[in-house]
């Protein structure tokens, strides 16, 4: 079936649902590998990607592994001292702000790149992320995004660089660019089919499932990565309905209260369900 692009019309269920949140910014982008159908709503709004930027880090880790520049079984020292891109001054990550605490008790020890990558994705470990970014190089992460032809996505720094944040020097992405990235992984076009399958397996282990997967039917697998910082809440992934090709989906939100994240999760879960019903019936 030929590809067709559908921009959400005013009377569709998705647009109607989003209109219930006039004081929030809600973006959605979908690509259905079965039909080539695309669904967009505010998909080009640029936002802070929060921890969804960990997917590009994972892609560069696997690219360098494929190129023989590193081994996934290589062990990296665990430390908590990093340098701001603003002036090189040192900063440390706050354990309280990290959704994975396990590595902080292991400072001075080591862990494999494979396990650090898993913790970065399934538990959204900030410390694992910064360790991996120092190993592969932040500039290489961003360069690989560009080499893949993914527009409107930039990774320029690691996590919790507060000096950079105060100067608005941040990573950025849109729902459209994130869906483009997840589509390429689903299609096996990032590095190799084997590498994509391995990255999908990592994302299938995601431990935070309050958004895209929450209201989908039983038996539907979702390989995804969540993101949250301040009042940005996102989820990007690949949804695998039974007995058909998957679809790539990215949901970005801004403006939900930081102290009640359930509002954002519930909104994204509803949107995911609406899109699933539209595509699958």
Spans of features found by a protein language model:
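Active-site SXXK
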Residues: 36, 49-81, 120, 249
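Extracytoplasmic
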Residues: 23-26, 42-44, 52, 71-73, ...
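Conserved catalytic neighborhood of penicillin-recognizing serine enzymes
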Residues: 83-130
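Acidic helix-start/capping segments at beta-turn-to-alpha-helix junctions
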Residues: 72-92, 136-137
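Mid-domain, small-residue-enriched loop/turn segments at the edges of structured enzyme/sensor domains
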Residues: 25, 109-113, 127-182, 187
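Structured C-terminal helix/loop/strand segments within mature extracytoplasmic catalytic/sensor domains
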Residues: 10-23, 37-38, 135, 179-210, ...
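Beta-lactamase-like hydrolase cores
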Residues: 4-48
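Soluble non-cytosolic domains of exported or imported proteins
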Residues: 8, 47-56, 107-115, 122-123, ...
